[in-house]
Amino acid sequence: MSKDGLISGLKNRILQNIARNAPGATSLRVTLHRWRGVKIGKGVWIGYDAIIETSHPDYVTIKDGASVGIRAVIIAHFRELKGVVIEEDASVGPGAIIMPNVTIGRGSVVTAGSVVTKSVSAMTVVQGNPAKPIARVGVPLKLDVSLREFSQKLRPLGKI
């Protein structure tokens, strides 16, 4: 590893560790991840202790209005760099794990603790390990939407 690569890697890891514990789910935490190279849109919310791709943050895109829950993990590579995209107004629940080469569709919801190994269609709720679709979203789970309104507009998909 070159000296520049080592310094860049150290900077990335230091910023990652600060971001995990920093206050400001819509401000400082987001800014620190941007400094690391994560592509982050407007109005993004990143929860406490979320881990966003430790080695190649530039392979992660989080679009406008998306949220990443507390202690969620986003992995953009295993052996090959594949990337992860979280589309507009998508919500990744607490403790969820997003694996490489996955896109979380616009307005979709990944429930707490789910492991997502395949891309998720827009406006879909997924759950489990591996995550499977369980419902269609009627209104995205944005910060200004009540849980009551969100849940009333869900359409279950039936037996999984």
Predicted regions and their residues:
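Terminal amphipathic alpha-helical/low-complexity segments used for targeting or macromolecular assembly
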Residues: 1-37, 42-43, 107, 124, ...
